[in-house]
Amino acid sequence: MPSKSKAGPDTISSLRSVVPEIFDAAQRSATGHRKHAVALHSLQSKCHSVDVENLTGEMAFTQEFIRNLNKVLGIKKREPSADKIVKLVAIFVQVGHEIDAKAKAQRQKHKQKSGDADDVFADPAADDDEEEGDTVTSRFAESLIKYLLQGFQAKEKMTRVRCCQIVAMSVTNLGAIDEELYFELIRKLTERIRDKEASIRVHAAIALARLQSSDDGEASEVNEALLDLMQNDPSAEVRRAVLLNIEKNASTLPFVLERARDVDATNRKCVFVKVMAAIDYRLLSIEDRERLLVAGINDRDSGVKRACVRMVGESWLTFAGQNLLELTAALDVVDSPAAGKVMQALFAAYTEIPENLSFDNDLWETLTPEVAFVIRATLEFFAERHDSDQLDRHMPDGMRLAQMLEAMGAKLESETDDEVRADHEFVVHQLLLIARMSDFPDELGRRAMLTLMRKMLLVPEIPENNIEAVSDIIRKLSVSEQDFVRIMVEVISDVREPMPTEADGMPAERVRIESLLIGIKCLIIIKYLLQRCFDKLNDGSSIYALLTECIVPAVQSSETVLQEFGIECLALCCLLDRSLAVDNVVLFAQAVRQGAGELHAKGLAALLDLALMYGVADLAPALGAPDMLIKILRNELHSSDERTQATAAEGFARLLYAHRIAEPAPILEELLVLYYHPDTTSNDALRQCLAYFFPAFSYMSNENQVLMQQVAVPTVCRLGGVLKQQAGEGQAGATQSQVAHQVVTWSDPRILDAISVMNGTTTAMSSSGLRVAARMNSYAQLGVDALKKTFSATPNTRKVLVQMLNRLSLDDTTPVTHTQQLFVLVRTLAQQELITDMITRNAMVRFEATLLKLLDVENPDDVNLEAWIEEPEMESVFEFVSSLDEDGPDDEDELEGAESAGDDDDDEEDSVRVASDSDVSERHPSEEPVLAGLNLRSRLPASSAVPSRSPMKRARQERLEELTREIDELL
């Protein structure tokens, strides 16, 4: 309510002192903001009462308030005093509306008691204004918003930021404002969410999100603008602002769930901790829950994983009434691939949950999918923690477990409803997983379980995942590997025994299908048998019988599916016998060359596994040429099928890591090119594998890092054309400069040393001065290779290579010989005038200064080149300098696409070709390159003289003069 204290002209005149005092106090501390806001409102009420009819006092207060606010509009971000004033403005508007609301409630209460008719002194006009929301606070808010909207178009970035920030913080407390102003505000904010400054877009998005309303006609347009911003804005902070403030409803929720795969880890974390934690999981479809959990629990960022688990353990479990079974039912455990991971992560984060669980006899007798899943997950949790006490407390004995499995199997066989059968199959699988964790201490239980497992393998329609679990249980129950093989061979023989024939009265097609199904089942059992065998094959092994009777016929079969399983089983056999692998490598190569689909994929996997097991050198001779195996596998790196490409890349990564390739450099270079090539942008499996491989490989040993140093420059050069073309087409991806920076980082021996120290693997030998010098020797050679390539590279690649030199970070441990070689090459490059842009020239000057510092020389003229020429280590560099010819930049090393990447390079190349040999001899002394400083040619002996090369500037000038003469002749 308005203050009853006396107000007059003195109140207006005191504004210039009182308001600044309040602002000054507010910017010093944020603790008294509400007190300052109340003081401002009291002052505003006094000013309002000065001239109620013309609002003179009220306008004076508003003008003084804005005058003081102006002083913070241009202050930079994260300035505490300015941020406190912004907060004061928002609280002041909020306090005003709260006081107005209380006053309105009191008036209504008074009217209800006395009645409007009895109040003869009531002001009808004032009442109407109050009902329509026309109050001192609302008028002030409208004036403030109108003023701030003018700042939305300011040239100064910080003015736009502060105006949007104040609007964003005040917009929720605006109350009812003029409709025209409301739409104007939305229009202006919609413009600001396209501002080039991310901080402005953040505040504009927050304000726009808080103005969402399902009642106005522009709601859909606002939602569309915000959704587009949340999906496509390059700033993670802007996307996060929309994510946290956009209205959550049926139309926006799918887009909110997409942010669980945002490239920014903080945004992904916000989805789980702040957004979805506040939404009842029952409002989501099963598919949405599944996508959300899969994204969270499989996230590479540990913080996002913890956020996902926290959402389930604190929010979803609360919505489920702390009922774990109800929550498990919501996870759809029967069909969910992520439910197991989620439950294990939940138990690990909240250990009190599994520790307080108990499973009575009634629960075991009435197993549902949810109950069986929780029991299995609990036992698995204790098994992974090696908590034998808890495991023994919950684990049933072997005999009882066998009885439950047998009873559930009987239910499964008698059930006809597909949905119920799926539930029973799931329960059986969970019981098998539980049995796999049991130690079977009692002999009776062990025998009963072994008998039951053999029977289960004979069930015609047993799922493949159950075959795998049964194989594990039989292996655990067997006394040795030979005993396990014997049991499984007997089971396979029993499966094949009732092989159907036409004599049984079945149609030929039915006989073929039944025989095919039996053959597939036998091969699946053989696969899991071989995967659990580790002993080398001997002449008396029962596996040879399986090889002859099942595997070889399957490989030779006309049925593609049998060939696929046969190839896989044959590869597993070859892993147990080297001679068998050598004999069959041609078969696997044929599957890769001529096979399609799964046959091709399994043949490729077989070749890669065998190469990793025995080495390429042992297998290659069987193919007729030492490099034939590498050629076959290398062709798969360029397959049009992304899965094949990723498999080949992963296989080569393993081979390189295990040092199984005799000449690894070309393969490593190929993988680097593949990793950065635009054509593999959509191949997430390939890029994820290589993103882990390159740093792991480089920082594993000094030998690997030397290999990375050898291929760094060729990789950068090869990628120049395609990456430039990609940038020209507006596609997102790495630039050539980023590639150069990354390979230099992977080649840095000091990072390897730091990792060795961190892991505690540093030895006296590895840290010795001799070893450090050897590592820096190969690292400096990377710079030599880069400089040599600049003389024949395209202009764009040349710029990247020169800028790459400053990232080498050479120091006192760099061998002097390499420092001298780098200096000679840098001076020669400067003399050739191949570097034309100022940025690259400055980079070369900086690198030259680094070299002079390492050489302990202040002036380039002080370098004694005559002495260097006599050094044997410098011979190769001077020979290279003397071999430089008249050819222009050579882009043969670049991949396809360089021609269409742009015309700039072509122009420069053409200008180089225009100058003739005679032009070189006409050069005057004054035309020597500015950067040369030191005439290298004059100090070389005649045999090592560097042939002069026509500089670009002179070539362009000659070409320009020639064109001018032609134009004059035409005119």
Question: PLM features: what roles do these ranges have?
Answer:
Residues 1, 126, 191, 195-197, ...:
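Primarily eukaryotic
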Residues 2-81, 85-88, 284-550, 635-638, ...:
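Long internal repeat-built scaffold domains in very large eukaryotic proteins
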Residues 54-64, 73-264, 270, 274-282, ...:
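Alpha-solenoid helical repeat scaffolds
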Residues 108-127, 921, 927-930, 934, ...:
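Fungal intrinsically disordered, low-complexity polar regions
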Residues 793-797, 814-818, 935, 940, ...:
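Short amphipathic alpha-helical interaction segments
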Residues 893-933, 939, 956-971:
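Low-complexity, intrinsically disordered regulatory regions
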